[in-house]
Every structure is written in C-alpha cells, then in structure tokens.
Amino acid sequence: MAEVEAAGSGTETGGGSESGNATGSGSGWRRPHGPLQRYYGPSAAEAAEATPDPADINGPHFDPEVFLTKVRSECRLGELLSREATLGREIRALDSDMQTLLYENYNKFISATDTIRKMKVDFRRMEAEMDDLASNMAAISASSARVSAALQDRHRRGAQLAGVQALLRKLQSLVEVPGRLRRWAAPGADPARALHCYARARAVLRHYRHLPSFRAIEDESHSIMAELAQRLRARLRDDTLDPKELTECVEMLLQLEEPPEELCEEFLSQAGARLEAELAALEAELPPSDPSGTASTPPPASDILDFVDRGSSAFVSNLCLLAASYRSLFEGRPGSGDGRLEAFASTLTTRYFELLERRLALERGLGDTSLLVRALDRFHRRLRALLELLPAAGAEAGAALVARAARERVARYLRALQTFFLGCLGDVRQALAAPRPPGKDGPGLPDLLATLSSSVLGQLKAVLAYVQLFTARDVAFASLPYFKGEFCVEAVREGLVVAFVRWLCRTARGFADSPAERGAPAAPPALLLLLARLCLDYEATTISYILTLTDEQFPPEDTGPAVTPGPALCAEARGAAQRLLDHYVQVQGAAVAQMLRKSVETRDWLGTVEPRNVRAVMKRVVEDITAIDVQVGQLFEEGVRRAQSSDSSRRAFSVYSSSRAPGRYAPSYTPSAPMDTHLLSNIQKLFSERIDIFSPVEFNKVSVLTGIIKISLKTLLECVRLRTLGRFGLQQVQVDGHYLQLYLWRFAADERVVQGLLDEVAASAAHRCLDPVPMEHSVVELICERG
C-alpha cells in the first residue's frame, strides 16, 4: 500500500507540475511536461468533446484521490502491486524520452548558433571588401572621364577623315565599274558578278546622272550590259540548256530589266520544247497505237516501274522545277498571269497521262501486282508534288488514271479466277472420265469436291491479298477518297467477289440450262451432282465467309453505295444447286428410262414365251439405281423416309396380289376380267395421292432417288400403254414389276409411290392384254428369288 501511495503521490506531483507549467512555476526539468502531454495525450478538440473522467490517468481532468480510491476498491493486492510496477516503468520511459528529446534539441540549437556566428563574421569581411571595390570603381570612372574629354577633338577629326576616305573609295569603285563590267561580262566570264556589280552601282549612277562624269560612267556601263543582254537572249534560245541554266539565264535578263512578258513567253517556249523531247523519248519506248486492234503488239522492253521512274525523274521532276522557277521569276510581274503556267502544265500532263495509259494497257496477264502498285505509288507521289505547285494541272485526271489502273487489274483478276475455275472443272471432268484399271478405284466425289472447293477458295483469297496491296497504309494513293470507299465496294466486293460468285453460279447452272452443242459431250451426271453440292456449300457457308473476309480486308464506308446482301447471293447459289440437282435427276432418270423404253419397244409381247426369269434389263435397272444411290450418298445426306410397312419387300402388284385378294376369288378372273380390273385400278387412283413426276428435288439422297425412280417407272408405264400384250407378256410384266418392287422400294422416300406406279403399270398391262391371265403370286416370288 505504501508503494501505491508513493506512486499516487508521484502522479499527483506530476499533475501539480503540469499545473505549475500553466502558471509559469515549478522546477526546470518539469517544464517540457506540457509538450509531452500535448504529444502523447489527446488533442484539445478531443479533450473538449470527451466526458470529464477524473480516474483517467492520461486525461486532463485526472484526480489522484479519485484514482487511488477507485483502484483500492476494485483491485486486489497483487493487482495493485502489478499496477504500481507498470506505472513505474511508464514513468521511467517517459523521463528517458524527455531527456533524449531535450538533448537532441539542445545539440541542434548549439549547431545553429555556431552557424549564425560564423555567418556574421563572414559578412563583416565581405562588407569591407565591397567598400574597397566601390572606391576603386569611382576612381576608374573619374580617370575614364578625364581621358575621354582629352581625346574628344581627336575622335571628331578621325571620324571626318574616315568619312572622306569612304567617299573616295566609293568614287573610286564607281570609276572602276565599267572596267569590272567589261571584264566580268565578257563571253565565258562571270556574268552573275557583273550583274551584282551593276545592280549596286545603278542607283547611284542614276541619282548623279546630271553630273557629266557620272553620265559617262552610266552610259558606258549601260552599253556593256546591253551587249550582255543580247548574249543572254541568244543563250536562252539554246536547246541544250537544262532547267537550272534556263532559270539562271531568265533571272539575269530580268535583273537587266528586260520585258517580263517577252521573257515569260520565251521561258515557257524553251521549257515546253525540252519537256516535249522528254515525252517523245517516253513515247519512243511504246509501240505505235493500232486503232483497229488487229496488229499484235510486242511486249514492252522494260517493266512498268522502270517506265514510271524514268517519266517521274525526267518529265515530272523537270516540270516541277520549271513551275517553281516560273513562280519565283514571274510571280507578280506584268504579263505573266492569266493562268498561262497552268494551261502550259495541263497540256503537258495530259499527254503524259495518255502515254502512261498506253503503257498500262501493254500489261498482259496479271504480272506482278506489287510492281504495278509501286509504280502507281511513285507516279502519284511525284504528281502530288506537282499539284502542290500547280493545283489546276490535272489532279482529277491523275487520280482517275490510278483508279482506272486499279479497276483494270481487278477485272483481270476476275477473268483469271474464271479461267482458274474452268480449269478446275476440266480437271474434274478428266478425273471422272479417266479409265481406271480393274480393282483400282479413282478419286471419290468427296475428294474431288474438296479439291475443287479448296482450290477455288484459296485462289480467291490469294487474289484478295494481291488486291489489298492497292489499299496498303504505305501506299500514297490509298488515301484518295476513291480507294477508301468506291474501290472497296464497287471494284472489289461487287466487281470481283460478288461478280465471281454470280458467274460461278451461272456457269454451274449453264450445265443444266443450256443444251449441249452438236458434237460436244454432255456434262457427266457426276459433275452435275458435284456442282450442285458445291453451290449448296456456297449457299451454306462459303458465301458468308467470303463476304465477311472481303468486308474485313476492304471495310466499306457507312455512307457508301449499296452492296449486294449476302442472302441474295445465297439465294442464287441455292437456285443453281436446285436446278443442277433437278437436271441430274432428269438425266439419270432419262438414262434408266431409255433402257426400259428400248426393252419394251424391242420385245414381241404377243409371241413371248412363258416367263421363267426376270429380264436382264430389270436387273440392270436395279444395278444402275444402286450405283446412283452410292454416288448420291457420297455428297448428300440420307434424308427422311416415310415409315415403311412390314411387308414392303414382299408386295406384288395390287391388282394381281394374292396378299390383297383371298385365294378363293382367284379363279374368278376370266378373259372378261380386264374391264373390271381397269375399273378397279381407276377407282383406286381416286383415293390415292397424286404422284408428281417432275416435282422439285430436295437436297438429300432419298429425294433424288425417288425422282429418278418416278421418271423411270412413269416411262415404263407409258411404254406399256402403247404395246399390245399376250398372256405371257402380261405375266412377264408381272414378274418384272414384282422384281422391281422387291428392290426399288428401299430407295424411295415413300414406298407407296413405287407401289402406285407399279400398280398403274400392271393395270395398263392388263388393260392392253388380249388374254389377261395372271401368274400365281407364289410362282412370281419363286422366279424373282431365283433371279
């Protein structure tokens, strides 16, 4: 308890010291208690806002008695001893921090005091030196003033003598002007120095012309310069002058005050003659133009880039130099206006453009597109430099020339794509028609289709990459409005991509629409099938991919011309595919029908013997349709079939089918039965679905085979209707029909179509039979199974 009281008294003493600090009393080592309190304790605002707590040892309202009373009442003896030890440690730590803070601040204060004392000593020494410097400057100023006053008269006399000497020099130089002019204006000398000398002396001589001596000097100088002007005019007419020498000659004549309008005319005349000679040199490299176009032109000796380089470095560069010289020589002078330079330059550039057009027309085939783009780029850059000097010298014509060259190259790429596609078709036809060794299969239709499609698409992508060179960022003319909008849309997208796709669809459709020329082989059915699949693939994916790729490489402007929508192209491709597939069905159906027609027309149906086998032509029909099924299945999906009945493979003709008529009614057929049978067949037609023979074919294998079977059986029906049959002829038709039913129903989308057509064949045969006695169904089945 004594230790707690001692700690409490110590704390109270601290509180008293703080109070003493506030009033200015207390011991010296307690003075920093206030700053420590402000540093470690709460801020004034927090202390004002907090509720006064006399038991808070760190608070401003701490009361030792209240604190001790609270501690003694709440804590045990052990806790009191621990609290006393803690307070002792905190007090010692605070004292140590206070002493450290005092020592650090004391050292800084001592260092600052020493620095200030040293600065005072240094400033005293500098003040003494500045006083000495001021006194010395005053003495120097006084001495300088005395010297200037003593030498003022001499300086005035010296200036007068210098002026007289300068005047004498000028007079001497004026007297020497005629001699200098004569020496420098002589032939082969330096006329530029003579002009410079005469220009400096001319104003003085004219000003003092009223003096006889100066008049004589002026007259002699004028005579010398007149002779120089005559020699310069003679030199101006020399055809060997280059543009720089021509400009210097005209400039010297203008300095001699020759008439500007005459010099302007001669300058343009001489410049025009030189430029015409350069154009003639370019034209000499070109073959003579043939208006009829019948004569074959030889290939050019140099490439287009070399031709443009020579034209740009010679003609365009000289024209730019002459235009700049004309502006510097005659700008603002009388007689040089009225657009004379613009008209002069426009005439020459028009002829240069014509020569370049003729050279571009000599580019045969595709050549190197990058070379053409570089040539057009250099031409446009040089032309742009000329147009900065002469805006009216044919800017539109130059841009139009570049645009025409780009369009012509795109048109050639279109023709190249068309030729490439026709070549691929020729390869496909050759692969389809090539004889194959026994036991070795040729390339399948999927492989041929993949090769054809990938080759054409790869060629088209390569063409787009070549055409993209015209819109590259490093090409100067790519910034023209035409190449940002119209070229991308009309020339590339519409003129190349869309035009090629439409041409491809028309070409493919032409195999179905246009009849084969006399003597020319018709398109093989496999080619029709392959082209139909190709057009269908274009409609599904290829067209959208090509258009997307084109729009990415050649982005159209938002306000550009209207473009062909993708769905319209897809509709054309689908229409071509539909026409090709329909034609394929007609061709294959006609081939099978031709076999059936010949087999019916060449047989004696009245005198035929009792059937013992299925005719070979029926087996051939089944084999051909099976082969067609395999062929179509390579390129098209299976398709949807109508639900088949359980006895599809066992059906016979409905008219003579024992499965449909009870056995007890079979003997009722007599020679008078055909009328009843025909009537029964017609009644059945009223309740059956109408069979459309030439309906549009769907893009699947089942629909294609159904169309071929319908054409074949319809042909068989029409041929049977035109023949007269005996009993065995009817039975042979019955056997053949049952055989076809056994094998053809599985190829059709709906077996009822096959059944209905075969029923009509049977009814027609019975109607045309003289003795309609059918064969037993069991015998028919036995013959067909054996066959």
From Swiss-Prot:
Keyword Transmembrane helix included in the entry's annotation: no
Comp. bias regions, Low complexity: 1-10
Location in or out of the cell: Golgi apparatus, trans-Golgi network; Recycling endosome
InterPro entries reported in the protein's UniProt record: Vps51
Coiled coil segments of this chain: 111-142, 265-287
GO cellular component terms, A-Z: cytosol; EARP complex; GARP complex; Golgi apparatus; membrane; recycling endosome
Residue ranges of the region described as Disordered: 1-39
Bias kind Gly residues: ranges: 11-27
Its job: Involved in retrograde transport from early and late endosomes to the late Golgi. The GARP complex is required for the maintenance of protein retrieval from endosomes to the TGN, acid hydrolase sorting, lysosome function, endosomal cholesterol traffic and autophagy. Acts as a component of the EARP complex that is involved in endocytic recycling.
Family recorded in the similarity comment: Belongs to the VPS51 family.
Subunit structure: Component of the Golgi-associated retrograde protein (GARP) complex Component of the endosome-associated retrograde protein (EARP) complex.
PANTHER family listed in its UniProt record: VACUOLAR PROTEIN SORTING-ASSOCIATED PROTEIN 51 HOMOLOG (PTHR15954:SF4)
Protein's name in the database: Vacuolar protein sorting-associated protein 51 homolog
Source organism of this protein record: Gallus gallus (Chicken)
